[in-house]
A protein has these predicted regions:
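N-terminal Rossmann NAD(P)H-binding glycine-rich loop of SDR-like oxidoreductase domains
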Residues: 1-24
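Oxidoreductase cofactor-interface core, primarily capturing Rossmann-like NAD(P)-dependent enzymes
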Residues: 15, 22, 116-227
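Conserved glycine-rich Rossmann-like NAD(P)H-binding loop of the short-chain dehydrogenase/reductase
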Residues: 24-32
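NAD(P)H-binding glycine-rich loop region in Rossmannoid oxidoreductase-like domains
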Residues: 34-38, 42-93, 97-101, 112-118
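Alpha-helical membrane-targeting segments
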Residues: 38, 158-181, 225, 230-269
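Short alpha-helix in the Rossmann-fold core of NAD(P)-dependent oxidoreductases
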Residues: 84-88, 107, 126
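Mid/C-terminal beta-alpha module of Rossmann-like enzyme folds, strongest
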Residues: 194-257, 271-312
Length: 312
């Protein structure tokens, strides 16, 4: 039995589908919510309902579980996200329950740049969570991924919404000079599933990214081409972008850019470009070749919907 936290999210739905397609039995850990969860369509899974601060619920969810994929995190909530409760305390509770249950493998999805000494909240939280996992005594695999993209992501769809909602120009933090390494979601998930049967990948931390380095400016230009929207790209200092984003996050229920994303874009976020083919035998898709999800969508309407829709 495999338990997946965050199994209804962007990565989780794809991971659950691939695991089931490969013959694994999967249980999704759902947090209590009034809203109907976005379970993977047409995929046979079990469900356990528990928040990450409910130790009794977590113990019940672990019954019969041999492998845990921990995907849940607070960054998707933007400035309203509680990194301490979800990424740090939640990971500590989940690893404790997994250790008590005799779990044999624990996967954690982290970020390039994760470090408990980081000045950036998300990367610091991920670094602290990694330490909990390494010290838990459970055989682990930590995947520090680059920016992921695909249908329903926060990255390319967020850019598409910003382009649609921008009046002729788009502000680029530091001129879009930051170097990134976007990795297609399905390639990343294939790495997660493939490594499950590889003993050499136990008790290891892997940094993985896509097969090309692109500046943020290049990425925005490619997204403009895919969506058919041209905008003047205006360089802006991150010292100005950050307080502006803080204000926008406070005004609107949701916003396509969060302070967490701006922190992530302060420095280059890359790793060895050959990591995925060398370690996993997968040739990662090029960024421009996997943007069909951006075409033919009324992004202006989606932008307004995001601004005024509450989180579940």
């Amino acid at each position: 039995m495999i338990l997946v936290s965050g199994g209804t999210g962007f990565i989780g739905r794809s991971l659950v589908r691939q695991l089931v397609e490969n013959g694994y039995t999967v249980r999704i850990l759902l947090r209590p919510s009034r809203r109907t969860p976005r379970l993977p369509v047409g995929v046979n899974v079990e469900v356990a309902v528990s928040s990450l601060d409910d130790t009794r619920g977590l113990r019940a969810a672990m019954r019969g579980v041999k492998t845990v994929y921990h995907l849940a995190g607070g960054e998707g909530e933007g400035g309203r996200g509680n990194l301490q409760a979800v990424d740090i305390d939640g990971t500590a509770n989940l690893t404790a329950a997994a250790a008590d249950a005799g779990v044999e493998r624990f996967y954690y999805i982290s970020h390039l740049g994760a470090d408990r000494a980081s000045a950036f909240p998300v990367l610091k939280a991920k670094g602290i969570a990694e330490d909990y996992i390494r010290k838990s005594g459970i055989p682990y695999t930590i995947m520090r991924g680059s920016i992921l993209f695909g249908p329903d992501d926060n990255f390319t769809t967020g850019l598409a919404m910003l382009l649609a909602g921008s009046p002729g120009l788009l502000l680029l933090p530091e001129g879009g000079k930051t170097l990134l390494q976007p990795l297609w979601l399905e390639d990343f998930v294939s790495c997660l599933v493939w490594s499950l049967e590889e003993p050499d990948m136990v008790n290891q931390v892997f940094e993985i990214g896509g097969g090309e380095y692109l500046t943020l400016r290049q990425i925005v230009e490619i997204v403009m081409e895919a969506t058919g929207r041209r905008r003047l790209l205006v360089p802006v200092s991150n010292h100005l972008m950050r307080p502006l984003t803080v204000v926008l996050e406070a005004i609107f229920q949701r916003f396509p850019v969060s302070v967490f994303w701006l922190d992530y874009l302060v420095v280059n976020r890359t790793c060895a470009v050959d990591t995925v083919p060398r370690l996993f035998g997968i040739m990662p898709a090029r960024f421009a070749s996997r943007l069909d999800h951006l075409r033919g969508v009324r992004w202006g309407r989606e932008y307004l919907r995001m601004l005024f829709t509450r989180h579940g």
